[in-house]
Amino acid sequence: MLDQDLDDIHPLFQGAPQTTEFKKLRKRIVRYTREAVEQYGMVERREDGSLPKWLVCLSGGKDSYTLLAVLYELKWRGLLPVDLLACNLDQGQPGFPATVLPEFLEKMQVPHRIEYQDTYSIVMDKVPQGRTYCALCSRLRRGNLYRIAREEGCSAVVLGHHRDDILETFFMNLFHGGRLATMPPKLVNEEGDLFVFRPLAHVAEADCEKFARAMNYPIIPCDLCGSQDGLQRQQVKQILDTWESNSPGRRQVMFRALMNARPSHLLDPKLFDFTGLALKNIDNSTETEEIPELR
């Protein structure tokens, strides 16, 4: 089904490049996304036959555009039985082009909701000078997205984090948090009433960037994050870039390791019962000729 002509698809793909290179890129992204959706059980099968509804978060960055496009292609081809609602949270950052996303979504015939919440002022007021904005900004954004999802009757909030985000988070937790953890592809929020999905979990950042650029999507940079130097994530990204440059394919090897954990070969007694290890009850005795007792 993925070999259909590009013109016979959702408007998000209309005008896509007809090059062999782009077609291979598109098919790879679609394949990896479908793989993650199926592997992590993201689609609910409801007894009443109704379709689950997903809130697809759209920031205006390359990753969220790629996410929206690939989910709509899967749905268009009958491979994703869900209803999709795109959502942009305008957080009141100075210079944010408020009309870009609504106009784009209208043109692409995508159902959407645009929400304005001035979290920018809260972040600037609460975060001390010299500290990073990302943690508080993300927490405020996530809270608003959960609220919107509930108001719209959605069962899941869908985010555009990709393979490289997941790797970077793993190493940030390793280097700065002293734990082995990262962004999971699927989780339930603390309240227990919403799923959080990351369908691009297997997709490389470079592929998202190539795709969004080739499609000429109107990219909106995050000037708030980009205005800060020395961010931990940026430092980790530079380390991973160096490793990848020295050993091409290193990122994918490390990512596969996250899918191949061996608790018995780590050191966390909460994950593996080391105290319960026991030797097999093997009888090592052998029959020997009885030696007469000396008198």
Swiss-Prot record:
Q: Which cofactor does it need?
A: Mg(2+); [4Fe-4S] cluster
Q: How is the cofactor bound?
A: Binds 1 [4Fe-4S] cluster per subunit. The cluster is chelated by three Cys residues, the fourth Fe has a free coordination site that may bind a sulfur atom transferred from the persulfide of IscS.
Q: State where the protein is found.
A: Cytoplasm
Which pathway does it serve?
A: tRNA modification
Alphabetized, the UniProt keywords read: 4Fe-4S, ATP-binding, Cytoplasm, Iron, Iron-sulfur, Magnesium, Metal-binding, Nucleotide-binding, RNA-binding, Transferase, tRNA processing, tRNA-binding
Q: What is its EC number?
A: 2.8.1.-
Question: What's a Gene Ontology MF term here?
Answer: magnesium ion binding
Q: Which reaction does it catalyse?
A: cytidine(32) in tRNA + S-sulfanyl-L-cysteinyl-[cysteine desulfurase] + AH2 + ATP = 2-thiocytidine(32) in tRNA + L-cysteinyl-[cysteine desulfurase] + A + AMP + diphosphate + H(+)
Query: GO BP, one example?
Result: tRNA thio-modification
Q: What class of enzyme is it?
A: transferase
A Pfam family matched in the record? ATP_bind_3
Lineage, top-rank taxon, reads Bacteria
| Coiled coil (UniProt feature) | none
Residue sites binding [4Fe-4S] cluster per the record: C134, C137, C225
Motif PP-loop motif, residue numbers: 59-64
Q: Which Gene3D superfamilies match?
A: HUPs
Q: Name one GO cellular component term.
A: cytoplasm
Q: What else is known?
A: The thiolation reaction likely consists of two steps: a first activation step by ATP to form an adenylated intermediate of the target base of tRNA, and a second nucleophilic substitution step of the sulfur (S) atom supplied by the hydrosulfide attached to the Fe-S cluster.
Subunit structure and binding partners:
Homodimer.
Quote the function comment for this protein. Catalyzes the ATP-dependent 2-thiolation of cytidine in position 32 of tRNA, to form 2-thiocytidine (s(2)C32). The sulfur atoms are provided by the cysteine/cysteine desulfurase (IscS) system.
Tell me which family the UniProt entry assigns to this protein: Belongs to the TtcA family.
State what protein this is by name: tRNA-cytidine(32) 2-sulfurtransferase
Source organism per UniProt: Ruegeria sp. (strain TM1040)
Encoding gene, per UniProt annotation: ttcA
